[in-house]
Each structure stands twice: as structure tokens, then as C-alpha cells.
């Protein structure tokens, strides 16, 4: 088993999908969390100057979803068939497209608040309706077993509920899916022991 070192801020953010996968697959890794104050001196040392990165076998891999796909490859978490893997990837990419619209780094607080409000009030309901329809009466997004798409839904929706607590009130099936993910023993244990951060 390779030695893994995950580098990210002390928050859930874009690294949490990687942490969920490590937890579920029972893979040991170093969860190295950096403080915002240290970021300016660390940034120039990284390929592409972004985190999270995963250090493995002398390589530094960037891009959270690429790392997640690497870790889930050849496991059922990715999907059991090529078609199911494509479906899981599509759900993840749909969620990621939306989460990437938020201006997390915007310095103008008034503008940031307006943009967040627009996304949460007008665009989020459309996304949730589509996800609810896609889930339908299935137990998980891709049928009868959990994939990393379900993990990513739980992670993204947790952040959305921090930003707008009542957002899922009319989507009981999506709430139920969150609950099922959080009830998986390995995920439940991780949620209990992880550092408590807002995002």
C-alpha cells in the first residue's frame, strides 16, 4: 500500500471527497492541514499552485476530482460497469459545476453576498429539482449500491445547508440519501472524528 499525504486547508472544502473515500476504503493517509496564514509561502512550491494535492510514490497529484477518481478506480465506489462509472462521474461533475459557481474568494463582501444569494435562491432550486428527478425511487444515485457520487452529494449538500439551512425542505428523497451516506459506519465514524469547521 502506498504512503499517502493529503495537503489542504483546515476545512472540508474540496478535500472532503478524498477524505470520505479514504475512510470508506479504510486506507491510511496523512491528513495534513495548513493554516491560511501559511498558504502564501506554500503556494509557490506546488504544481499549479492549488490545493488539495495528494503526495503518493514521489508524485504530487492535483485536482480533487482527479484524485478521487484515482482512489476509486477498480472499486465499486466508482461504479461497477463503464456505464455506471460514467453516470457517477456525471452526477459528480454536475454538482461540481454548481459548487464552482460560488465566488468563494471574492473580497467585496457586498458583491459576494449578492452572488451567493442569487445562486442559492434562483439556481440551487433548479439543480435540486433535477437531482431529485434523477434519483427518483432509487436507493442511491446509481441504483442499488453506494458510489462516490452519493458521497459528493452529501458533502456538497452539507455546505449548501450551512449557507441556506432550509434548502432541502421540499426534497425528502435527497435528505434521505444524505442520511444513508452518513449512516455508513466508516463515514459516520469519520464525521464524528473530523475537525469541526464551518465549510
Curated annotation (Swiss-Prot):
Homodimer. Its main location: cytoplasm. It catalyses: prostaglandin H2 = prostaglandin D2; RX + glutathione = an S-substituted glutathione + a halide anion + H(+); 2-glyceryl-prostaglandin H2 = 2-glyceryl-prostaglandin D2. Bifunctional enzyme which catalyzes both the conversion of PGH2 to PGD2, a prostaglandin involved in smooth muscle contraction/relaxation and a potent inhibitor of platelet aggregation, and the conjugation of glutathione with a wide range of aryl halides and organic isothiocyanates. Also exhibits low glutathione-peroxidase activity. Keywords: Cytoplasm, Fatty acid biosynthesis, Fatty acid metabolism, Isomerase, Lipid biosynthesis, Lipid metabolism, Prostaglandin biosynthesis, Prostaglandin metabolism, Transferase. It is found in: Cytoplasm. Belongs to the GST superfamily. Sigma family. Expressed in skin and oviduct. One of its GO terms (cellular component) is nucleoplasm. It comes from Mus musculus. The gene is Hpgds. InterPro entries: Glutathione-S-Trfase_C-like, Glutathione-S-Trfase_C_sf, Glutathione_S-Trfase, Glutathione_S-Trfase_N, GST_C, GST_superfamily, Thioredoxin-like_sf. GO terms for molecular function: calcium ion binding; glutathione transferase activity; magnesium ion binding; prostaglandin-D synthase activity; protein homodimerization activity. This is Hematopoietic prostaglandin D synthase. The keyword Ribonucleoprotein does not apply. Glutathione is required for the prostaglandin D synthase activity. Residues 81-199 form the GST C-terminal domain. Its cofactor is glutathione. The keyword Nuclease does not apply. Its EC number is 5.3.99.2, 2.5.1.18. Glutathione binds at residues 8, 14, 39, 49-51, 63-64. Residues 2-79 form the GST N-terminal domain. One of its GO terms (biological process) is response to nematode.
Amino acid at each position: 500500500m502506498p504512503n499517502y499525504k493529503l495537503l489542504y486547508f483546515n476545512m472540508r472544502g474540496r478535500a472532503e471527497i478524498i477524505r470520505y473515500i479514504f475512510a470508506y476504503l479504510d486506507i491510511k493517509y496523512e491528513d495534513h492541514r495548513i493554516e491560511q496564514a501559511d498558504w502564501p509561502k506554500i503556494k509557490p512550491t506546488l504544481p499549479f499552485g492549488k490545493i488539495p494535492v495528494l503526495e503518493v510514490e514521489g508524485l504530487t497529484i492535483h485536482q480533487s476530482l482527479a484524485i478521487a477518481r484515482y482512489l476509486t478506480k477498480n472499486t465499486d465506489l466508482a461504479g461497477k460497469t463503464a456505464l455506471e462509472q460514467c453516470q457517477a462521474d456525471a452526477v459528480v461533475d454536475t454538482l461540481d459545476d454548481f459548487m464552482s459557481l460560488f465566488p468563494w474568494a471574492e473580497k467585496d463582501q457586498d458583491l459576494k453576498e449578492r452572488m451567493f444569494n442569487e445562486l442559492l435562491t434562483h439556481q440551487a432550486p433548479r439543480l435540486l429539482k433535477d437531482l431529485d428527478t434523477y434519483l427518483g425511487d432509487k436507493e442511491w444515485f446509481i441504483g442499488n449500491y453506494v458510489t462516490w457520487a452519493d458521497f459528493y452529494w452529501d458533502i456538497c449538500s452539507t455546505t449548501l445547508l450551512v449557507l441556506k439551512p432550509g434548502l432541502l425542505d421540499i426534497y425528502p428523497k435527497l435528505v434521505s440519501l444524505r442520511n444513508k451516506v452518513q449512516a455508513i459506519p466508516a463515514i459516520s465514524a469519520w464525521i464524528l472524528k473530523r475537525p469541526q469547521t464551518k465549510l
